[in-house]
């Protein structure tokens, strides 16, 4: 009964509230002023009225640095939510690294602040007090004799480079030093620098100096110690408690070290601990990871020429004698190819290394959030020149051509060998007419038609002649405007490529005897992927539609391959190379190659090369032929198919089972920007910062930003 009476009272109260609401509504209809007050109330709603789940999701887009700190000061609710967001950011990033579910953000192009000088072999560390990354020293690729002693600070909240003008005793200009954080100080130790060019034959200089930098005071201080390690560079160091542990390094004169030194950061005194058992080989350039307060992990390194290490060692720092323990490395085939010049960084129970992608053909990361690269725009036509270049055979005494005026890979002409008939022996080069420029680029463009309307979509290999005489006489014009060659060969056929005419010197008997047979293919069908080695000509798998007046080795090579394919089929195929004068290769419909055989016109579309397309770089090349390419490999591999990939080493079973294991990823998100070496990797708040480094000259670094690039690796949203 009591419950029924209570329900009745509740119903009565509900009715009374409805009546009151109706009366209030009637009064509002009579008086317009309360309506304005209600509308004001609706417009004055704040974010505090949102559900906490929605608010927490919105706050997760804030920068984990200063923006988190500022948002936590708004109210108690936001303070509590920011703590959860920061925790989720950290652990979410660790999980993303373990699963390979990351994204890359690029700061390769000009960003706020004074641009830092391009460098490699520099030192870097993260200082949480002002949420910045500090970079010291290094050297530059433009001058091997130049080393820096400048200090830069990257504000990770604004992504702005700041150069603090510090006072005190500056360190010497050097590279290969280590920079670690101890309390409110940055400790710099070791390093090396190249000698001045004159006088000649001076040795490199190595340092054993210790400098400290105080970010709060903006002050450098030189620490004088005694009975310390010899001058060294390329060593590794870390801080555990109030001790800095230093291992290995290069001592100069091709001498490496495997000694361990300990610096007391309170007393600034060196000591050398007693270590029992076998020890790692002397090395430099290794990575040193802190496992816990009594254990260190040493990974990789270089012991000298042809002595690159991929091993892993544990250093147990017990109260008694210290001891080394070798670790078993599992899934080594899926590990980083090179460890000595690619530093490692710990993220949770994993160690992250950024090294070269194993396949060498993986595309660059599609998640690089930067402005379009200069290599991704459609280039203008290359301006013809009057000089002549001839291809070099990959089999030669020197791996690369010398560097002349900063250009690598200059193709030098060969002596021509004349035959009794007056033509050059084994020559497969074209004879150009006055109005027959050659196409630009390494491929025929998607809309370009070859051999009576057929489109060649895949890279085609030009096989070097088998005989020395044919090799000496092999001639190829690269990016040039040449005078027509008359009288070389009696039979000349007209091969039309798009709107551009190419006059080729055909000699069926000579070409069939000196050119190897190729796989069964038709001009209309797709061509199989050739081997990577070419005859000294480097060609990207896709080049956009070229304009008249441009010359490229790829167009010559592909057209030459079409001639070989047709000449191997007999006289009927050779006759089809000369289309009627009234026919246009770019006319709609299909055109006849021989009786009963037609080839439809190819539609425009991205050309495919090894499973992915690659835009050209001719705009950056200007009117020069490619000069800094890797001889014997296609251009797209030399420039764009050596990306940097994330490798993850699982270290959770290091102490218990004495093993480490490389993780296997199938996701393409681990593939990032072009590979660099001697860069730095620093862990911030829920991200990794990769800065600087040295890019191999074989990756066409002259036309791609290289050594002051800045990348952020974060968890993929």
UniProtKB/Swiss-Prot annotation:
Phosphoserine PTM sites in chain numbering: 365, 373, 552
Q: Output the superkingdom of the source species.
A: Eukaryota
Intervals holding Kelch repeats: 132-184, 186-242, 244-293, 295-342
Where along the chain is composition biased (Polar residues)? 416-426
- Residues crossing the lipid bilayer are none
Entry-linked Pfam families: F-box-like, Kelch_3, Kelch_KLHDC2_KLHL20_DRC7
Sequence ranges of Low complexity compositional bias: 363-376, 570-595
* SMART domains according to UniProt: FBOX
- Biased composition annotated in UniProt, kind: Acidic residues: 1-30
Query: Region Disordered: what ranges?
Result: 1-34, 361-452, 570-632
What does this protein do, in the record's words?
A: Substrate-recognition component of some SCF (SKP1-CUL1-F-box protein)-type E3 ubiquitin ligase complex. Specifically recognizes p53/TP53, promoting its ubiquitination and degradation.
Q: How does it assemble?
A: Component of some SCF complex, composed of CUL1, SKP1, RBX1 and FBXO42. Interacts (via the kelch domain) with p53/TP53; interaction is direct.
Please state what the protein is called: F-box only protein 42
Q: Which organism is it from?
A: Mus musculus (Mouse)
List the top taxonomic levels of the source: Eukaryota, Metazoa, Chordata, Craniata, Vertebrata
């Amino acid at each position: 009964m009591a419950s029924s009476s209570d329900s009745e009272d509740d119903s009565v109260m509900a009715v009374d509230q409805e009546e009151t609401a109706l009366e209030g509504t009637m009064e509002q209809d009579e008086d317009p002023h309360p309506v304005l007050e209600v509308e004001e109330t609706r417009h004055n709603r704040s974010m505090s009225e949102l559900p906490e789940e929605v608010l927490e999701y919105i706050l997760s887009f804030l920068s984990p640095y200063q923006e988190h700190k500022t948002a936590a000061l708004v109210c108690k609710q936001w303070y509590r939510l920011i703590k959860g967001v920061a925790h989720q950011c950290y652990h979410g990033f660790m999980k993303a690294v373990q699963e390979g579910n990351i994204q890359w953000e690029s700061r390769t192009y000009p960003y706020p602040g004074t641009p830092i000088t391009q460098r490699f072999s520099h030192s870097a560390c993260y200082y949480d007090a002002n949420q910045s990354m500090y970079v010291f020293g290094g050297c530059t690729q433009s001058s091997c004799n130049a080393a820096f002693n400048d200090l830069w600070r990257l504000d990770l909240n604004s992504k702005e480079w700041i150069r603090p003008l510090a006072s005190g005793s500056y360190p010497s200009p050097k590279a290969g030093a280590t920079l670690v954080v101890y309390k409110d100080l940055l400790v710099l130790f070791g390093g090396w620098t190249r000698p001045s060019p004159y006088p000649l034959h001076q040795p490199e200089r190595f340092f054993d100096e210790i400098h400290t930098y105080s970010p709060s005071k903006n002050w450098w201080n030189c620490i004088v110690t005694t009975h310390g390690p010899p001058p060294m560079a390329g060593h590794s160091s870390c801080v555990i408690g109030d001790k800095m542990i230093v291992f290995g390094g290069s001592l100069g004169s091709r001498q490496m070290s495997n000694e361990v030194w300990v610096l007391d950061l309170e007393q600034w005194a060196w000591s050398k601990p007693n270590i029992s058992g076998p020890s790692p080989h002397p090395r430099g350039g290794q990575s040193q990871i802190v496992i816990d307060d009594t254990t260190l992990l040493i990974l990789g390194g270089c012991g000298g020429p042809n002595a690159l290490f991929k091993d892993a060692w544990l250093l147990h720092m017990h109260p008694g004698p210290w001891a080394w323990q070798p670790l078993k490395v599992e899934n080594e085939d899926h590990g980083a190819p090179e460890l000595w010049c690619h530093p490692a960084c710990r993220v949770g129970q994993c160690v992250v290394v950024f090294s070269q992608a194993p396949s060498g053909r993986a595309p660059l990361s599609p998640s690089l959030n930067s402005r379009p690269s200069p290599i991704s725009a459609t280039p203008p036509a290359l301006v013809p020149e009057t000089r002549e270049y001839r291809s070099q055979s990959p089999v030669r005494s020197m791996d690369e051509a010398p560097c002349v005026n900063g250009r690598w890979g200059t193709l030098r002409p060969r002596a021509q060998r004349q035959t009794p008939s007056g033509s050059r022996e084994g020559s497969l080069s074209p004879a150009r007419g006055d109005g027959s420029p050659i196409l630009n680029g390494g491929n025929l463009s998607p809309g370009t038609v070859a051999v009576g309307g057929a489109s060649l979509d895949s890279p085609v290999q030009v096989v070097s002649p088998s005989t020395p005489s044919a090799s000496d006489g092999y001639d190829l014009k690269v990016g040039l405007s040449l005078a027509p060659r008359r009288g070389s060969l009696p039979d000349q056929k007209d091969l039309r490529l798009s709107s551009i005419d190419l006059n080729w010197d055909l000699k069926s008997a000579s070409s069939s005897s000196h050119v190897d047979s190729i796989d069964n293919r038709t001009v209309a069908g797709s061509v199989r992927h050739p081997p990577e080695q070419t005859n000294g000509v480097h060609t990207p798998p896709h080049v956009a539609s070229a304009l008249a007046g441009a010359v490229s080795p790829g167009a010559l090579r592909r057209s030459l391959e079409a001639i070989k394919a047709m000449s191997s089929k007999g006289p009927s195929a050779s006759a089809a190379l000369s289309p009627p004068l009234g026919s246009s290769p770019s006319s709609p419909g299909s055109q006849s190659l021989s009786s009963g055989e037609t080839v439809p016109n190819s539609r425009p579309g991205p050309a495919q090369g090894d499973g992915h397309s690659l835009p050209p770089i001719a705009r950056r090349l200007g009117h020069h032929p490619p000069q800094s390419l890797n001889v014997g490999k296609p251009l797209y591999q030399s420039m764009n198919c050596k990306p940097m990939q994330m490798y993850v080493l699982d270290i959770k079973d290091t102490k218990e089972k004495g093993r480490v294991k490389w993780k296997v990823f199938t996701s393409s998100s681990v593939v990032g920007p072009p590979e660099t070496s001697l860069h730095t990797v620093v862990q911030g708040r829920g991200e990794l910062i990769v800065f600087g480094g040295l890019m191999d000259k074989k990756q066409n670094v002259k036309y791609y930003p290289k050594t002051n690039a800045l990348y952020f690796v974060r968890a993929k949203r």
